A protein has these predicted regions:
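Signature of Gram-negative outer-membrane beta-barrel scaffolds
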Residues: 1-96, 113-114, 118-120
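Transmembrane beta-barrel strands of outer-membrane/channel proteins
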Residues: 1-2, 59-63, 105-109, 137, ...
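Membrane-embedded beta-strand positions of outer-membrane beta-barrel proteins
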Residues: 47, 59, 91, 105, ...
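Residue-level signature of outer-membrane beta-barrel architecture
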Residues: 48-53, 63, 85, 93-96, ...
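Gram-negative outer-membrane beta-barrel transporters
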Residues: 53, 154-156, 175-256, 285-288, ...
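Membrane-embedded beta-barrel scaffold of Gram-negative outer-membrane proteins
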Residues: 96-104, 128-204, 292
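Outer-membrane beta-barrel "beta-signal"
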Residues: 134-136, 311-324
């Protein structure tokens, strides 16, 4: 017998222990939930001035005409309209310290619409606005086969969307947070150490805080490290490894207070690392077989600390590819 499930705004799931598989099809009338209309027109340009053999200035910008209208019948949400005409400048400078090392700095403003972030009244939040400052180094080696970079940045934004859980009404909405500051560092190296050895590694650190110095989104990791390497053992056989590591995260906030030790643990994901291995072998010119061993140590983790869905467990995938 066919069975159905009625989705409603209460978000109540029937007790599965009492469900016998037989449920009458509900009479659900078609109701238009609402509509959204967005228009985004932009014009951009850039130029570069070589002041000396080593010093260069870069300037540019983008003019944006962004319009958005949103209306929803759900929960009697009101009609919402946004119109913005914004110029986003970009300024930068670079200086060649030597043939293989360049220092740079840059400045730009931020305009980032967020039409999917609705406030408690069902209206989209104002676009994010702010400024970004960056300072860094770029280097090359091994006759241009290997590139590396290091950068530090400061990002200041207003109207940043913060997720709020409304358990009473079974919904999620967002509120704007102003005067936020993100400080971070990014390091990367990639290329070939030899004709047979490929490597790509990166590290990123960032923390987003409000004007009181508190973390705004602790559910995102402050530290991320990624390493991929592959080596041609022979002309036919290639072996690779991929490592991903991130620092701990949590979803503990005032919304869940008072919170027991067990509750805090349930909303916390400790730091973790995963390892993937690959092997690919060429059979002739047109055929290749491959083995992909994902999450070798079967690490159990949650990508988001407040969503109790675990990441991909240990798995082995074999592929056969032939090109005609």
């Amino acid at each position: 017998t066919p069975s159905y499930y009625e989705e409603n705004e209460d978000g109540i799931v029937p007790d599965l222990r009492l469900f016998d598989g037989n449920f009458t099809k509900p009479a659900i009338p078609y109701i238009r939930d609402g509509f959204a209309h967005m228009k985004n027109l932009s014009v951009y340009g850039s130029t570069r001035f070589k002041l000396t053999d080593r010093l260069a200035l870069i300037g540019g910008g983008r003019f944006v005409d962004w319009q958005y209208r949103y209306s929803s019948n759900r929960n009697n949400f009101a009609d919402s309209r946004h119109k913005n005409k914004v110029f986003i400048p970009y300024l930068g400078a670079s200086y060649d310290l030597n043939d293989n090392l360049t220092a740079y700095t840059s400045y730009t403003t931020i305009f980032r619409p967020q039409p999917r972030y609705l406030d408690r009244n069902g209206k989209p939040l104002e676009p994010q606005r702010g400024k970004t400052y960056e300072l860094g180094l770029k280097a090359s080696g091994f006759e241009g086969r290997l590139n590396a970079s290091a950068a530090a940045f400061i990002n200041k934004r207003d109207h940043l969307g913060k997720e709020i859980r409304d358990d009473e009404h079974q919904r999620i909405y967002y509120e704007s947070v102003n005067n936020t500051t993100t400080k971070g560092v990014e390091l990367s190296v990639g290329g070939r150490l030899s004709d047979k050895w490929l490597i790509n590694a990166s590290y990123a650190y960032s923390k987003l805080k409000n004007d009181a110095g508190n973390l705004v989104n602790p559910s995102y990791p402050a530290h991320l490290f990624k390493l991929f390497t592959a080596y041609d053992v022979t002309d036919r056989l290639n072996l690779g490894a991929n490592v991903n590591w991130q620092s701990g995260t949590n979803a503990v906030s005032d919304e869940y207070q008072p919170l027991t030790a067990a509750g805090k643990e349930a909303l916390t994901q400790r730091s973790y690392a995963t390892l993937d291995l690959t092997a690919h072998y060429k059979i002739g010119k047109s055929t290749r077989i491959g083995l992909d061993f994902e999450n070798v140590f079967n690490k159990r983790y949650r990508p988001m600390p407040d969503i109790h869905v675990y990441g991909t467990p240990r798995s082995l995938t074999a592929t056969l590819k032939h090109t005609f």
